[in-house]
């Protein structure tokens, strides 16, 4: 069986590396052959919206999946070829537009932020008056890792917010949630409808970018809330593959922030830290194979390597640290790799992950100590 992956970033690369031992072949489509996926598999080089190339991908593959959710759904509809597309395009469309995403959460009874659609300076002012301050003005599409956002703390920020993002209208305004922590859940649903959940991840962001994930985050009440929300989304979309939901924890309850219809950065710890990684389970699901166990092997942490890589030797000399280099060129704010560790207790994990974080990302370490 050949699995096609639209996008050849690090997520696609890790999917292929997880799928080769299962006996699958992989074919990527990406605008640049010099990508992480290009290190591990052949690439059809061209625009992700090129319907001719997408059609060739579907003709050469048995199933097609994604490592990025912002591929225009219109380009993927009605393609020739034998390939099934998973996850379903309805889920992709909902995740691409923050307004559709919020409405989906509301439809399914999943608590989320208060929000309003904004398409002009006047509707922004109305939204601020209705929802209140502080709040966040966001682009409705192509927002990730903190991009396309402006925080308003007083009414004096209205002009600056519109100046910054007005040209990208339509937009979304939502209240700024006072939260205690951020968590995510990674769920997977097979072609046969079987569902499995990984334990909750406890996440630390700085400047809108994930810096540190620890798992499992043990909280029975929040786990039930997260699994209930994920199951509703999986069933609503008749979903196949891995789905991630990010939440704020506010006053003991979960507030859904966003969903990602793909494998997720907060699940990278599963490569070493779970019986079956999120990447292997995604491949299993879209290929119609039985799902693997999502049980953790211990207490794990994942630290992102952002902007520049630390000295590799300094990491590799420490027992139990796992180094993942995506082979990308350095650039401020860019995810270049990650480091993981697995310990026998949560305390050991926390102590060691803070120590490693202090060496790799001192600004984040100072912010959370």
At which residue positions do the language-model features occur?
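Active-site nucleotide/adenylate-binding loops and adjacent lid/helix of ATP-dependent enzymes
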Residues: 94-184, 188-233
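Active-site "cap" helix and flanking loop/linker of ATP-utilizing ligase/carboxylase catalytic domains
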Residues: 224-245, 250-251, 260-308, 312
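ATP-binding N-terminal substructure of ATP-dependent carboxylate-amine bond-forming enzymes
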Residues: 1-103, 107, 122
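A short linear hydrophobic-aromatic micro-motif
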Residues: 114, 134-137, 169-174, 243-244, ...
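Short, low-complexity Ser/Thr-rich regulatory SLiMs
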Residues: 187-191, 247-251, 327
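Peripheral (often C-terminal) accessory segments that flank ATP-dependent C-N-forming ligase machineries
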Residues: 284-369
């Amino acid at each position: 069986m050949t699995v096609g992956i639209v996008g050849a970033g690090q997520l696609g690369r890790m999917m292929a590396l997880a799928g080769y031992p299962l006996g699958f072949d992989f074919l990527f489509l990406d605008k640049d052959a010099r990508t992480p996926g290009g290190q591990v598999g052949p690439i059809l080089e061209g625009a992700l919206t090129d319907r001719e190339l997408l059609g060739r991908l579907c003709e050469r593959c048995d199933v097609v999946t994604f490592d990025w959710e912002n591929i225009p759904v219109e380009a993927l509809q009605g393609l020739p070829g034998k390939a099934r597309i998973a996850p379903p395009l309805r889920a992709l469309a909902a995740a691409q537009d923050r307004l559709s995403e919020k409405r989906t959460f509301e439809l399914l009874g999943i608590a989320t932020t208060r929000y309003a659609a904004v398409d002009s300076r006047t509707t922004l002012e109305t939204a601020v008056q209705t929802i209140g301050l502080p709040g966040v003005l966001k682009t409705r599409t192509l927002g990730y890792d903190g991009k396309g956002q402006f925080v308003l703390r007083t009414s004096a920020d209205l002009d600056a917010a519109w100046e910054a993002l007005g040209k990208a209208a339509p937009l979304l305004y939502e209240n700024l949630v006072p939260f205690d922590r951020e968590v995510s859940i990674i769920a997977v649903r097979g072609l046969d409808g079987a569902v499995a959940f990984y334990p909750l991840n406890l996440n630390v962001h700085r400047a809108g970018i994930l810096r540190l994930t620890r798992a499992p985050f043990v909280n029975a009440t929040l786990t039930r809330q997260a699994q209930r929300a994920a199951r509703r989304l999986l069933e609503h979309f008749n979903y196949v593959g891995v789905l991630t939901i990010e939440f704020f924890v506010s006053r003991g309850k979960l507030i859904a922030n966003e969903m990602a219809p793909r494998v997720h950065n907060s699940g990278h710890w599963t490569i070493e830290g779970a019986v079956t990684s999120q990447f292997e389970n995604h491949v299993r699901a879209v290929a119609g194979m039985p799902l693997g166990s999502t049980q953790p092997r211990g207490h794990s942490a994942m630290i992102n390597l952002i902007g520049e890589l630390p000295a590799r030797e300094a990491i590799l000399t420490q027992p139990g640290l796992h180094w993942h280099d995506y082979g990308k060129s350095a650039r401020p704010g860019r995810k270049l790799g990650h480091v993981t560790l697995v310990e026998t207790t949560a305390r050991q994990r926390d102590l060691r992950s803070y120590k490693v974080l202090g060496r790799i990302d001192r600004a984040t370490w100072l912010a959370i100590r």
